[in-house]
Amino acid sequence: MIAASAALLCASAALAQKGETVKIAWLDPLSGLMAAVGTNQLKTYQLIAEDFNKKNTSGVKFEIIGIDNKLSPQETTSALRSAMDQGARYVTQGNGSGPALAIIDALEKHNARNPGKE
């Protein structure tokens, strides 16, 4: 997970303009049975972004937008909309195939409705 997070940050930095803030939506459970796992993962992502922000010289900053999806596909779709409204252009999720499929479906529909704004 840490290697994947670092790769995402590096790839995002390569595409971003100097001074830009890259917003990454983190959609996983922060409540219910998986709350402890989700809380730990979110803190990890935030620490990676914080560390990268301190060390990076490109002027690109990273912000993790953590949203509780309650491990529900429906909540995940709502969380994705909220994250996109907050300016997130990247999304990460790791717990549950139902939420993952909801993200894929929502992004495919969004991209079809908004060509060129993927």
Model-derived segments and spans:
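Cleaved targeting-peptide boundary
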Residues: 16-22
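Bacterial N-terminal signal peptides that target proteins for export
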Residues: 1-3
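Acidic/histidine-rich, surface-exposed loop or edge segments in extracytoplasmic proteins
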Residues: 25-33
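N-terminal signal peptide c-region/cleavage motif recognized by signal peptidases
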Residues: 11-13
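Short catalytic helix/loop segments, enriched in acidic residues and glycine
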Residues: 42-53
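Beta-alpha junction/loop-to-helix N-cap segments that form part of ligand/metal-binding clefts
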Residues: 21, 36-40, 55-118
